Amino acid sequence: MQTWGEVPSDFRGCSATRAEAYAQTQTLIWQMQEKTWLARHPLGTSSMHQANILDAVRERAGRRRGGVAVFDHLRPRQTAHIVIDLQNGFMGHGQLAEVPMARAIVPNVNRISAALREAGGVVVYLQHTIDEEAIRTWPVYFEHFCGPEHRARMIEAFAPGSPGHSLWPELDVAQQDLVVIKRRFGAFVPGSADLHARLQQRGIDTLIISGTLSQVCCDSTARDAMMMNYKVFFITDSCATLTDAEHGGTLSAMAHTFCDVRDTQSVLDLIAATR
């Protein structure tokens, strides 16, 4: 079977000119297909998740604490907006780890960052990073959860300095914001990042979680943060993953035990209420 971009067998052994012509034709076809896809699915306009907390979880939360909401206020100067893995490798069309719905959350992420920054809070961008240290210290993941081909492509995509490792250009990153390397899914486990130390230096006790993927890095970071005694808000429409089912499952798990789960406008209202 011919694979994409491979010269068919009847072209092999032909003159270089004929083979090159075939390759050029295939490239033009791919470019036309890409333009058609982008016209139908413009970057930054992917659909938002249609998912929410399970009714059973809402009922249990109501019995435990009176409702899904956990906190009735926040103090912006003690709060950090943690923006997780919104990098080209997760955001760009056709990228290895593309999460189309992650493009749709960027306006909400920027709104939260702007409001918190203006109110005196901290904005942190975490970058999923695969470098020599990550590979050396986390062999269980790289050797058992990734096949050889996928592992090689992920290393290439998220190596420091690679295009995929860079933050998505539509994010409104300010000069005072922090950009932190993250070598595990969760940002607080040993060997992942120096996030906890940086937050403690700034007197941060509350986190707002945004980013991708909802059920992997956002989930892992939020769970560990709560168990390290941070107050955690998990934002329904500024986190994204590949399917509504995965997103909804994460919201339910977070709301059950770990986080105050609410939407962008609700957390913006909490920030505004402090002024």
List each model region and its residues.
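Surface-exposed cleft-lining segments at the edges of enzyme active sites
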Residues: F71, F90-M101, I208
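Active-site loop signature of alpha/beta-hydrolase-fold enzymes
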Residues: G89, D131, T241
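A short alpha/beta connector and helix-capping loop motif
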Residues: R77, Q95-L116, G121-Y125
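Short beta-strand segments at enzyme active-site cores
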Residues: G121-H128, A134, I235
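Active-site-adjacent betaalpha module
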Residues: Q2-T3, F11-A80, A114, E118-A119, ...
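Aromatic- and acidic-residue-enriched segments that line the glycan-binding/catalytic groove
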Residues: A134-P148
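Acidic-leg catalytic submotif of subtilisin-like serine proteases
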Residues: A80-F90
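Structural recognition of the beta-strand scaffold that forms the well-ordered cores
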Residues: V83, V124-Y125, V179
